[in-house]
Amino acid sequence: MSYSVCAYLTEADKVKSVYGTCDNQLINQLKVALKQELDTLNDYFSDSLNTDKDAYAALADIVNGEIRYPEIAFMYGYVYEKICNHYGTQIYCAENLWQLDSQSTFIPIPLSDDFPYIISIPVSDLESKRTEYTSLQEGNGIGDYDYEQ
């Protein structure tokens, strides 16, 4: 088994504006725009879901500003990732970033104890984070993973 890190440069205000709007038109627009991704999530996690608790339900909860199924926190996290990608673009070469910060999101969703591990950094913090990340020495979460373990 392996892990991957996906980093997105996204418009935080757009992501934040999705949460709690209670806008059925927005739900429908996002369902159409993210259909392939949401269906893929549902297929991948089919053994952990039932018909009421799926990626579409998590999306509706996010837009409606409610969390009906905290037991599938992982799904809220993956749907959040899809929303970030929808309003932004994926960036690469971010393999070690997940070790550097505690989980955070632009919207109040439950965070999984496992995966996905989410770190949302506002633009106003990017320069200080860049300085922090580039000043790290090997062994502090950078270049110290033993792939043979």
Enumerate the language-model features and the residues they cover.
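Acidic (Asp/Glu-rich) sequence patches and key acidic residues
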Residues: 1-148
